[in-house]
């Protein structure tokens, strides 16, 4: 196993998720914090992932979790991930204000850590506007569900923090619909052509379509090699703090 996402659409014993399921309606809602980021067990998990050479994936986690993993949490005595994490399928909050997307304050931490945001093609995460329905989940906007909007997300990250820190994370295997013009991987040349048409250099386009991920993966391997020389594997059971699973929703036995 070479990478793992720290959560899905539910809190767990290790981290807070961005979105959870409302127990009454069954609808997804913006989450309320459980751990306020990474739990004590989560710090152990991330340390062992670093030692093993596993990519730490921040797609699906809350902003507090993003911040803890990228910048550490001094109160907990947690220095964050020693290797750069990735967002394997997330987009830009400033363009589409979905809790799953990455806000600007976190994008700046992505740059500091040499990390990577891979833009998700899910229509709900690329084309949306604020909603007043009380869920914290924005309203989908059909007219912007296009290849051009995906390019807008990519270029936003590239222009804000540099093209070393943006990639493509389609989520084709996890979504039911796609942006117009990006129905499948055969449309990738059109995406690259649109980036070039907007003035993105050949070199930067190459980073976006793969070289950035290879760079991050190389750094993850280098960190693992260093840690394995001085750090023993975590073989004890990680204490979960009374956390148990209840379907897709976790709860604490207090």
Label for each model-derived stretch:
Residues 7-11, 54, 59-66, 90-93, ...:
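Active-site beta-loop-alpha junctions enriched in small/polar residues
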Residues 8-24:
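Histidine/acidic-residue-rich, glycine-tolerant segments that coordinate divalent metal ions
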Residues 19-86, 99-114, 148-164:
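Histidine/acidic residue-rich metal-binding segments in metalloenzymes
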Residues 56, 89, 117, 171, ...:
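Conserved, mostly hydrophobic/aromatic
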Residues 120-121, 160-185:
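Short acidic/histidine-rich active-site segments
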Residues 183-254:
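Mid-to-C-terminal alpha-helical segments outside catalytic/metal-binding sites
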């Amino acid at each position: 196993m070479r990478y793992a996402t720290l959560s899905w659409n539910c809190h767990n014993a290790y981290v807070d998720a961005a979105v959870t399921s409302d127990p009454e309606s069954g609808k997804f809602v913006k989450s309320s914090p459980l751990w306020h980021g990474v739990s004590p067990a989560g710090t152990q998990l991330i340390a062992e992932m670093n030692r093993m050479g596993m990519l730490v994936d921040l797609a699906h986690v809350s902003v507090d979790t993003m911040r803890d993993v990228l910048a550490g949490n001094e109160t907990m005595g947690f220095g964050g991930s020693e290797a750069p994490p990735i967002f394997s399928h997330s987009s830009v909050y400033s363009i589409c204000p979905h809790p799953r997307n990455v806000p600007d304050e976190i994008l700046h931490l992505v740059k500091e850590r040499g990390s990577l945001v891979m833009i998700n093609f899910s229509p709900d995460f690329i084309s949306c506007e604020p909603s007043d329905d009380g869920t914290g989940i924005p309203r989908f906007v059909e007219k912007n569900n296009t290849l051009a909007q995906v390019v807008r997300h990519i270029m936003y990250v590239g222009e804000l923090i540099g093209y070393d820190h943006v990639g493509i994370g389609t989520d084709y295997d996890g979504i039911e619909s796609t942006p117009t013009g990006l129905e499948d991987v055969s449309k990738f040349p059109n995406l690259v052509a649109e980036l070039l048409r907007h003035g993105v250099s050949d070199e930067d386009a190459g980073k976006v379509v793969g070289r950035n991920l290879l760079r991050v993966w190389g750094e993850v391997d280098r960190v693992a090699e260093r840690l394995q020389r001085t750090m023993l594997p975590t073989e004890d059971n990680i204490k979960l703090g009374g956390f148990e699973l209840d379907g897709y929703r976790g709860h604490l036995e207090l």
